Amino acid sequence: NYYTPDYETKGTDILAAFRMTPQPGVPPEEAGAAVAAESSTGTWTTVWTDGLTSLDRYKGRCYDIEPVAGEEHQFIAYVAYPLDLFEEGSVTNLFTSIVGNVFGFKALRALRLGDLRIPPSYSKTFMGPPHGIQVERDKLNKYGRPFLGCTIKPKLGLSAKNYGRAVYECLRGGLDFTKDDENVNSQPFMRWRDRFLFVAEALFKAQSETGEVKGHYLNATAGTCEEMFKRAIFARELGAPIVMHDYLTGGFTANTSLAYYCRDNGLLLHIHRAMHAVIDRQKNHGMHFRVLAKALRMSGGDHFHSGTVVGKLEGERDITLGFVDLLRDDYIDKDRSRGIYFTQDWVSMPGVLPVASGGIHVWHMPALTEIFGDDSVLQFGGGTLGHPWGNAPGAVANRVALVACV
């Protein structure tokens, strides 16, 4: 009774679109019902305590199934979940239910969560991004163009002093931001406190010489939440405008906690998506990146890596622009051509700046500005530091190319 094709969805339901591949001989209706049951109130048998609650009120319902065009034995199962199944303001609880045990089901060869519709009645229980796009522009006093960034390379092995030197040269050359690589936490060759101190010196020197507000994404990701907060607090005490977090490896609970701290203390929050391809790259199993993007917007982040379309990392143009819109816009219409299964209304939740990063350089600038528009961060690592004349000329080249394109 978890397959209910007559069910009319409510405005408060959380809706999910699963791409499922049933085992041979398993009807799609049975597989869809199993997904709805296991991700809500069901278990492998009937239990007597079912009679002590109203399963009809709390159960998930598979309300529609459609075949995947061009694929044999693959189906899109649409499941509606009542709002009361989920703790308010908790991405952790949302994912524990919807993508928990169900992905290991024997009745399924593969299962992928393609999209989620988050109703305003649930999204309003989340703080969302600490500040959002407009507040960030006001803090930095920069308008009418994308922001320019650079990931410091080599990503591992530099001393703190040489790292700070590279930061200074890039910011002095015209970039708005430099960035810790996601791998950089606090290793023997460069402890986090030393890095923070040399970077702060570089930051303020570049600011005083250029008259522009500059930033460096100081990676606060750590092995414990306590250590993460220690690093974020030290960054704030130094006067840094922005910190960074690896939200998948760090975890949603840690990320949401850090986002609250950043809003309360005036820090911007840059989010890296390290580990995402483990979850989202297979087209038949796992979770699509657009779901991870929606989850991040709720959990909290001001910048988020979204792919480039033109760089070294995988990403189709229309699909990428679909989740860029889901990060930035208030209201996004259903559009299956871009992989958007449901209309999404974020109401007043602040937007997130998409970050284009990965194998891009100045020759990509016309395409990047056309694809991403003004509200974005264009981040060049090797595309800055690989300039034959050095780091500062690489930064100058990026800034000149950007000005020419906008």
UniProtKB/Swiss-Prot annotation:
GO terms for molecular function: magnesium ion binding; monooxygenase activity; ribulose-bisphosphate carboxylase activity. Its EC number is 4.1.1.39. One of its GO terms (cellular component) is chloroplast. Substrate binds at residues 101, 151, 155, 273, 305, 357. GO terms for biological process: photorespiration; reductive pentose-phosphate cycle. Binds 1 Mg(2+) ion per subunit. It is found in: Plastid, Chloroplast. It catalyses: 2 (2R)-3-phosphoglycerate + 2 H(+) = D-ribulose 1,5-bisphosphate + CO2 + H2O; D-ribulose 1,5-bisphosphate + O2 = 2-phosphoglycolate + (2R)-3-phosphoglycerate + 2 H(+). RuBisCO catalyzes two reactions: the carboxylation of D-ribulose 1,5-bisphosphate, the primary event in carbon dioxide fixation, as well as the oxidative fragmentation of the pentose substrate in the photorespiration process. Both reactions occur simultaneously and in competition at the same active site. Belongs to the RuBisCO large chain family. Type I subfamily. Heterohexadecamer of 8 large chains and 8 small chains; disulfide-linked. The disulfide link is formed within the large subunit homodimers. This is Ribulose bisphosphate carboxylase large chain. The lineage of its organism: Eukaryota, Viridiplantae, Streptophyta, Embryophyta, Tracheophyta.
